Amino acid sequence: MTTIKTSNLGFPRLGRKREWKKAIENYWAHKIDKAELDQTLTDLHKENLLLQKNYHLDSIPVGDFSLYDHILDTSLLFNIIPERFQGREVNDDLLFDIARGNKEHVASALIKWFNTNYHYIVPEWDNVEPKVEKNTLLERFKYAQSINVNAHPVIVGPITFVKLSKGGHQSFEEKVETLLPLYKEVLQSLVDAGAEYIQIDEPILVTDDSESYEDITRKAYDYFANEGLGKYLVIQTYFERVHLKFLSSLPVGGLGLDLVHDNGYNLKQIEDGDFDQSKALYAGIIDGRNVWAADIEAKKQLIETLQQHTQQLVIQPSSSLLHVPVSLDDETLDESIAEGLSFATEKLDELDALRRLFNDNDLSKYEHYKARYERFQSQSFKNLEYDFESVPTHRKSPFAKRKQLQNQRLNLPDLPTTTIGSFPQTREIRKFRADWKNNRITDAEYQEFLQNEIARWIKIQEDIGLDVLVHGEFERNDMVEFFGEKLQGFLVTKFGWVQSYGSRAVKPPVIYGDVKWTAPLTVKETVYAQSLTDKPVKGMLTGPVTILNWSFERVDVPRKVVQDQIALAIDEEVLALEEAGIKVIQVDEPALREGLPLRSEYHEQYLEDAVHSFKLATSSVHDETQIHTHMCYSQFGQIIHAIHDLDADVISIETSRSHGDLIQDFEDINYDLGIGLGVYDIHSPRIPTEEEITTAINRSLQQIDRSLFWVNPDCGLKTRKENEVKDALTVLVNAVKKKRQESESTTA
């Protein structure tokens, strides 16, 4: 058998304890200067590279590290600058402004990266002049060489980059052709600098419509081959299966395939002879998206199968390790569960164990991981019985009747205003929560602090003039982690952070066992907030689909079963809130769209299961109780009918960064439930103008019945500063008041 090699597609940027996030946010807050930021990030990049080197990888990725987002990096590399930001020097401050917006200009759109919880900044092609502006990829490659790291450069490929872009008058094919000479310039510079191969990521080739652009894909890679670059290129794909016969026909040196999330299709195509054995096979055999340890015996058998179909086998994670935490080393977890976990460094060590086994006949690491896996699997985490059939999955009455009863009960004005749920998580709030968790303050002291914050923000909302209030979620570190801490069957780590967008990090809980509600989760804070005001206060919950999608899910039972277990737990909390007198309850599902499978053949079942779980969680209440939900970051065209099927009394949707595109989705459906299309972007510190809010409202009312329309920001306000929140919400309420006055004068 031939020697196998090991490689990696990408590594977490955050650092073990979020050093990356803290440095960038300190720079934004003017607490450090650019020189200190650069030094901190250089040190972290070096640490990441050397850490990977410790696991004896034959090649280590460079170009995956970024100050914000690798797609935005590619935009700046090729001078694809949004028109409103043009005319400035291409540097890191420009990058941050495109991503976050500034006082003069809105940020670029923020979209989910395929079906993950990572987000990328959408490239904009309007009136651009593509050119290689600053070859930062070459700089990073040379840096890796300077510290004696055997690295391979990583760049997103032209097909994926253009497909994820928007704007411009050129066709898709014309944009690709425009970029090819620029890609050639960058790729040639890397080869000239000594790159043995270049990882060119084309995950778009796993999607449904990839066959419709096979011609331009072939044209692109034929071009690179004719320029003498083909043999240096390894096309990496991940998250799903590919059309392997086509991909193998491209004139490149190697192909990377996901052999974890492909539902077995990629392996079958290999076994059917569709892989060109003259190429290197980069086999994604270790799960890059979940945190469970590999069944190393099964991986050994898979490698033995793959060796029959290629002379050049490289084993790697199934995708970039961007989607998992850095290391288990700093965790203090129950060993019985920890033995079943594997973060980024552990996944690299699993690869090293397999490399040693096959190349050196060294069984030590292999036997270690095999024993750990067998001990973990010997435990039983399936020990609860569920009565799914006894819980209703439909509201008692149709929406029209519910709306009438809710209008009488709530007595809200025309164009009611609200927020999505969270208010700023200040340093003081985080400190109090940390002090409480570490027993540095008493329960009573912590509760007093929370009540003071809730009372302060109830008054702020009343003073601004909002119609439906929220308690602010000051007791919550994260909208999923909070529930993971309180529901049976979840494990919450201490340092299990992953990047969501920009400097935003989340700490997904790990679902290891059966899920159960054991006590009220949110009732105390919500009831206290309601006691302070005559206006309705929303109960704020996270929905079952989002909790599952934003957790590391267990793999020993079907996904639908876990999702419905969570739904029953949320149903218990919904009923507890209703019984406590809460009239409006929001069950957020921001991640419903992101979990949609990349292949359409799986869409119907996914959406059917998602709708069922949401209704399982929300249908037990009385007609008078108003159920809200919220979604964000998404392209909704594919799921608009499923959104309607949720039968939520009101849905709020992020739309501001789509620059109005989302409203087009409502032209094909007569949406007859309550809806709020977010009227300003909370991801940017920029304060909207009344004119912008009014324009957003007017545009929405062209498609949405006024009696159904709500006005709200597009997401929670957790990451904003207090003055930004107050100023923006004041603008929003003033704009709505003027719209109401216009209506009154028209009907007078």
Curated annotation (Swiss-Prot):
Binds 1 zinc ion per subunit. This is 5-methyltetrahydropteroyltriglutamate--homocysteine methyltransferase. GO terms for molecular function: 5-methyltetrahydropteroyltriglutamate-homocysteine S-methyltransferase activity; zinc ion binding. The keyword RNA-binding does not apply. Belongs to the vitamin-B12 independent methionine synthase family. Disulfide bonds: none annotated. The gene is metE. One of its GO terms (biological process) is methionine biosynthetic process. It comes from Staphylococcus epidermidis (strain ATCC 35984 / DSM 28319 / BCRC 17069 / CCUG 31568 / BM 3577 / RP62A). L-homocysteine binds at residues 420-422, 473, 588. InterPro entries: Cbl-indep_Met_Synth_N, Cobalamin-indep_Met_synthase, Met_Synth_C/arc, UROD/MetE-like_sf. Catalyzes the transfer of a methyl group from 5-methyltetrahydrofolate to homocysteine resulting in methionine formation. Its cofactor is Zn(2+).
